[in-house]
């Protein structure tokens, strides 16, 4: 006689085993209609699963995050159902849930086109409109294997052979004549799966191994209702308009080419943004009392063997050789910083020692993963490492956190999600050391009034870490900042200092990144601002234009005055109509356009116009210079009179 306890504390008593759906129906027909699955004693189960003993139960609907994930997973099965009807010889591989949607990897003879996707989506809707029940069956491993072998599903057979124990009872989900395999849960009926959209295809190797066959990956998105789906599609449309690759080309910021995959060719305007960002970071480094250093971009393989990188990271490292020695091009800066720390005897009085570098790093990312500035092979890290005593960890972490928020606020990022990753099962260091380290990180976040979630077991083997994920104007998440404690690397590389008792001790090392990759952060900013960079970051801050040739000398005088004040100004003296010039520079997202006519020459003033089309009238040139300098120096996100 199971007693079912609901989230509100109420209880329901039954004299026989009941399904999740039975309990939902007992509560009310509305809840039963909305029931996708259940959470029984913390574990997600299908709506059809029986509860045979006392249990805590929560009914899962499409309004719950778990419900939406289940719905998306079932849409992947719906995709499988449709593709097998249209192209029966297709072999199905894997179809997991991803952020905002799902994908399915398929082995199909022809290359899928946009027309194929439209046809596939139409068939999916036709199937979903039948509102058929999804039937779950738990079977023996052998029965599951026989089922898929008989259907020619080689990839499902391989999953069973290589990933599933012979003692397991896999779950088979029946969508009419189509059968798929999954741990579940899944929706009980396809009426939940009406609001989806197939998006694109790409190539994907089976098992992610380039030695295996290339499959075709079909991506889709799915939501609980039409309103959510349309809102997401609108966000995607806006994201496409903001794509940094498109804007980068329009604004002539950078380019990339096949001869240097994943490497950035910065053009003048893009490099101007890079250097301005670098200047800002340098100012903050000085404010927070960091040294700036520069290490070599490649070092002997022997050093990387000592650090453990060669054993655990070799496939991502570029190598070269000279005079019978093998060198690794650095994928990160930390080993070099330890080498600098090791030069000369250090005392506890020298700590904390804060060391920063704009480090040029290279990582051998798979070519298929490269994506504009967001995923590159050559990048610059705004990397820093703090060497300190165990007693100093809390204060130093506190300082790092303040620096993160200080810098992010300058760019207008307000929503920052913070996670604290704690000790994994395999780790070095005593439990006492880990407890203290985790407590120090948590206390620093709490002292700064920062809410955070724990990620149990997600820390590195050498220490816990804090991750800062910023959300942009489209609510996309970008993990940029980290504060990572390291109990391992200093000892591996023989770093030490003389303690108060005149004994040698190993310092704690704090890895600290805020922007992460400079290239990636510029990509994020380009999309956040849609190319409308705040004036302090804009490559060209002001364009001064004449209406006729008679104002040319005055335009040059005004331009020089602006340039002498340190403002990035250009003169446009072309023999073009003023409306054409204004439109062109507006499209180039230049913050300010100054127009000189005869009236301005006579009065010694200048007509000021913003890129958003706001006419600020004719102003004294010195006033314009002062106001622009105030805006630039304050790194304001807003233009004059906004």
Curated annotation (Swiss-Prot):
Binds 1 zinc ion per subunit. Catalyzes the attachment of threonine to tRNA(Thr) in a two-step reaction: L-threonine is first activated by ATP to form Thr-AMP and then transferred to the acceptor end of tRNA(Thr). Also edits incorrectly charged L-seryl-tRNA(Thr). One of its GO terms (biological process) is threonyl-tRNA aminoacylation. Residues 1-61 form the TGS domain. This is Threonine--tRNA ligase. HAMAP family: Thr_tRNA_synth. Gene3D superfamilies: 3.10.20.30, 3.30.54.20, Anticodon-binding domain, Bira Bifunctional Protein, Domain 2, Threonyl-trna Synthetase, Chain A, domain 2. InterPro entries: aa-tRNA-synt_IIb, aa-tRNA-synth_II, aa-tRNA-synth_II/BPL/LPL, Anticodon-bd, Anticodon-bd_dom_sf, Beta-grasp_dom_sf, TGS, TGS-like. Zn(2+) binds at residues 334, 385, 511. Its main location: cytoplasm. Keywords: Aminoacyl-tRNA synthetase, ATP-binding, Cytoplasm, Ligase, Metal-binding, Nucleotide-binding, Protein biosynthesis, RNA-binding, tRNA-binding, Zinc. Its cofactor is Zn(2+). It is an enzyme of class 6 (ligase). Homodimer. It comes from Yersinia pestis.
């Amino acid at each position: 006689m199971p007693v079912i306890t609901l989230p509100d504390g109420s209880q329901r008593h039954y004299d026989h085993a009941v399904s999740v759906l039975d309990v939902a129906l007992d509560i009310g027909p509305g809840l039963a209609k909305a029931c996708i699955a259940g959470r029984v004693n913390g574990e997600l189960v299908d709506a059809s699963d029986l509860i045979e003993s006392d249990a805590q139960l929560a009914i899962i609907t499409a309004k719950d995050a778990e419900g939406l994930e289940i719905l998306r997973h079932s849409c992947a099965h719906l995709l499988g159902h449709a593709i097998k009807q249209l192209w029966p010889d297709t072999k199905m591989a894997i179809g997991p849930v991803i952020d905002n949607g799902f994908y399915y990897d398929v082995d199909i003879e022809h290359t899928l086109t946009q027309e194929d996707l439209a046809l596939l989506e139409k068939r999916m809707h036709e199937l979903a409109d039948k509102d058929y029940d999804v039937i779950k069956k738990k079977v023996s491993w052998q029965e599951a294997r026989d089922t898929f072998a008989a259907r020619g599903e080689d990839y499902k057979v391989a999953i069973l052979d290589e990933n599933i124990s012979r003692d397991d009872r896999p779950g088979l989900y029946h969508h009419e004549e189509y059968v798929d395999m999954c741990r579940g849960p899944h929706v009980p009926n396809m009426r939940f799966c009406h609001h989806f959209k197939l998006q694109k295809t790409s190539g994907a190797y089976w098992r992610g191994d380039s030695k295996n066959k290339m499959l075709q990956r079909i991506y889709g998105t799915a939501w609980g209702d039409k309103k959510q789906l349309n809102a997401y599609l609108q966000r995607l449309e806006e994201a496409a308009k903001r794509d940094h690759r498109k804007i980068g080309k329009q604004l002539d910021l950078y380019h990339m080419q096949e001869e240097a995959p994943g490497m950035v060719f910065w053009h003048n305007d893009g490099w101007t943004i890079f250097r301005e960002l670098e200047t800002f970071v340098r100012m903050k480094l000085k404010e927070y009392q960091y040294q700036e250093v520069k290490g070599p971009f490649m070092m002997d393989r022997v050093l990387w063997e000592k650090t453990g990188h060669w054993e655990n990271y070799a496939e991502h490292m570029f190598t070269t050789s000279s005079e019978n020695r093998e060198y690794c091009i650095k994928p990160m800066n930390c080993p070099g910083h330890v080498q600098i720390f090791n030069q000369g005897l250090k005392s506890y009085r020298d700590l904390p020692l804060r060391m920063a570098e704009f480090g040029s790093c290279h990582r051998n990312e798979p070519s298929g993963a490269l994506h504009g500035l967001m995923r590159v092979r050559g990048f610059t890290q705004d990397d820093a490492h703090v060497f300190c005593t165990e007693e100093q960890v809390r204060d130093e972490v506190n300082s790092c956190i303040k620096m993160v928020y200080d810098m992010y606020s300058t760019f207008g990022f307000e929503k920052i999600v913070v996670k604290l990753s704690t000790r994994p099962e395999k780790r070095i260091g005593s439990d006492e050391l880990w407890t203290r380290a985790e407590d120090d990180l948590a206390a620093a976040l709490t002292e700064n009034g920062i809410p955070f979630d724990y990620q149990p077991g997600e820390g590195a083997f050498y220490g816990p870490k804090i991750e800062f994920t910023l959300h942009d104007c489209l609510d996309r998440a970008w993990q940029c900042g980290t504060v990572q404690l390291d109990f391992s690397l200093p000892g591996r590389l023989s770093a030490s200092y003389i303690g108060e008792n005149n004994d040698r001790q190993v310092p704690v090392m704090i890895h600290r990144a805020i922007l992460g990759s400079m290239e990636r952060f510029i990509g994020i900013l380009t999309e956040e601002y849609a190319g409308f960079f705040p004036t302090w970051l804009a490559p060209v801050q002001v364009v001064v234009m004449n209406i006729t040739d008679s104002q040319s000398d005055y335009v040059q005088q005004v331009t020089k005055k602006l340039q002498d004040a340190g403002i990035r100004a250009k003169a446009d003296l072309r023999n073009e109509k003023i409306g054409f010039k204004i439109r062109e520079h507006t499209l180039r997202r230049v913050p300010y356009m100054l127009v000189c006519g005869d009236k301005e020459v006579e009065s010694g003033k200048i007509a000021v116009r913003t890129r958003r089309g706001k006419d600020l009238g004719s102003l004294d040139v010195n006033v314009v210079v002062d106001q622009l300098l105030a805006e630039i120096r304050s790194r304001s996100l807003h233009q004059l009179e906004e």
